[in-house]
């Protein structure tokens, strides 16, 4: 097993803390809480911490550049640790997945997600692993207000179960590789018992 940069995308500040667009930050916060890890070291234009799993150290990164400039932070971390882009795992919200689903994917486009766009612009390509946290699409209205809006209380109540499912996926990915994790988890809805 080798080191990874696990970057959760979001916007800094209490105003954005519980918004749909901060699913990546919320994911890393849940991991840090459950694993008793601190993500508070100021580095790489973000907040960083270390998580050890199966005798391997992984860097947890919450860019503090705002979403549209997340690529700068991810690039700095990869360069510092001399890791290829394939060792980056980016956790982000995804409008195209229904709430309650989490999927793994390697490569692809940015799908209009400004954080992914920034990473691809900074690094020249999109060949990194994505852990996509489904937030669903708004029934009406524009997507900007939707992603920057807070989750309703009924979704907030369910969020830990979804994030815990995503953590299971991440652990499987790190322990047994992407194909195995995708085959076991990509068709699962974490709201179903």
UniProtKB/Swiss-Prot annotation:
<dbReference type="GO" id="GO:0072344">
    <property type="term" value="P:rescue of stalled ribosome"/>
</dbReference>
<feature type="binding site">
    <location>
        <position position="68"/>
    </location>
    <ligand>
        <name>tRNA</name>
    </ligand>
</feature>
<comment type="function">
    <text>Catalyzes the release of premature peptidyl moieties from peptidyl-tRNA molecules trapped in stalled 50S ribosomal subunits, and thus maintains levels of free tRNAs and 50S ribosomes.</text>
</comment>
<feature type="binding site">
    <location>
        <position position="114"/>
    </location>
    <ligand>
        <name>tRNA</name>
    </ligand>
</feature>
<dbReference type="GO" id="GO:0000049">
    <property type="term" value="F:tRNA binding"/>
</dbReference>
<feature type="site" description="Discriminates between blocked and unblocked aminoacyl-tRNA">
    <location>
        <position position="11"/>
    </location>
</feature>
<dbReference type="GO" id="GO:0004045">
    <property type="term" value="F:peptidyl-tRNA hydrolase activity"/>
</dbReference>
<dbReference type="GO" id="GO:0005737">
    <property type="term" value="C:cytoplasm"/>
</dbReference>
<comment type="similarity">
    <text>Belongs to the PTH family.</text>
</comment>
<keyword id="KW-0820">tRNA-binding</keyword>
<keyword id="KW-0694">RNA-binding</keyword>
<keyword id="KW-0963">Cytoplasm</keyword>
<dbReference type="Pfam" id="PF01195">
    <property type="entry name" value="Pept_tRNA_hydro"/>
</dbReference>
<dbReference type="InterPro" id="IPR001328">
    <property type="entry name" value="Pept_tRNA_hydro"/>
</dbReference>
<dbReference type="InterPro" id="IPR018171">
    <property type="entry name" value="Pept_tRNA_hydro_CS"/>
</dbReference>
<keyword id="KW-0378">Hydrolase</keyword>
<dbReference type="InterPro" id="IPR036416">
    <property type="entry name" value="Pept_tRNA_hydro_sf"/>
</dbReference>
<feature type="binding site">
    <location>
        <position position="66"/>
    </location>
    <ligand>
        <name>tRNA</name>
    </ligand>
</feature>
<protein>
    <recommendedName>
        <fullName>Peptidyl-tRNA hydrolase</fullName>
        <ecNumber>3.1.1.29</ecNumber>
    </recommendedName>
</protein>
<comment type="function">
    <text>Hydrolyzes ribosome-free peptidyl-tRNAs (with 1 or more amino acids incorporated), which drop off the ribosome during protein synthesis, or as a result of ribosome stalling.</text>
</comment>
<feature type="active site" description="Proton acceptor">
    <location>
        <position position="21"/>
    </location>
</feature>
<feature type="site" description="Stabilizes the basic form of H active site to accept a proton">
    <location>
        <position position="93"/>
    </location>
</feature>
<feature type="binding site">
    <location>
        <position position="16"/>
    </location>
    <ligand>
        <name>tRNA</name>
    </ligand>
</feature>
<comment type="subunit">
    <text>Monomer.</text>
</comment>
<dbReference type="GO" id="GO:0006515">
    <property type="term" value="P:protein quality control for misfolded or incompletely synthesized proteins"/>
</dbReference>
């Amino acid at each position: 097993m080798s080191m990874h940069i696990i970057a959760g995308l979001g916007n800094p500040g209490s105003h954005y803390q519980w918004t749909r667009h901060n699913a990546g930050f919320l994911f890393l916060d849940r991991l840090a809480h459950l694993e008793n890890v601190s993500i508070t070291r100021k580095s790489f234009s973000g907040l960083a911490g270390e998580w050890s799993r199966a005798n391997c150290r992984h860097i947890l990164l919450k860019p503090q550049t705002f979403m549209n400039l997340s690529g700068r932070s991810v690039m700095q971390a990869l360069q510092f640790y001399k890791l290829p882009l394939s060792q980056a795992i980016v956790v982000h919200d995804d409008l195209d997945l229904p709430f309650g689903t989490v999927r793994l994917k390697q490569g692809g486009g940015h799908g209009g997600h400004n954080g992914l766009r920034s990473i691809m612009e900074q690094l020249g390509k999109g060949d990194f692993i994505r852990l996509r946290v489904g937030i669903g699409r708004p029934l009406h209205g524009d997507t900007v207000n939707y992603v920057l809006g807070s989750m309703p209380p009924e979704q907030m109540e369910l969020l830990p179960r979804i994030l815990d499912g995503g953590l299971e996926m991440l652990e499987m990915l790190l322990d047994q590789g992407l194909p195995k994790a995708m085959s076991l988890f990509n068709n699962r809805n974490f709201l179903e018992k």
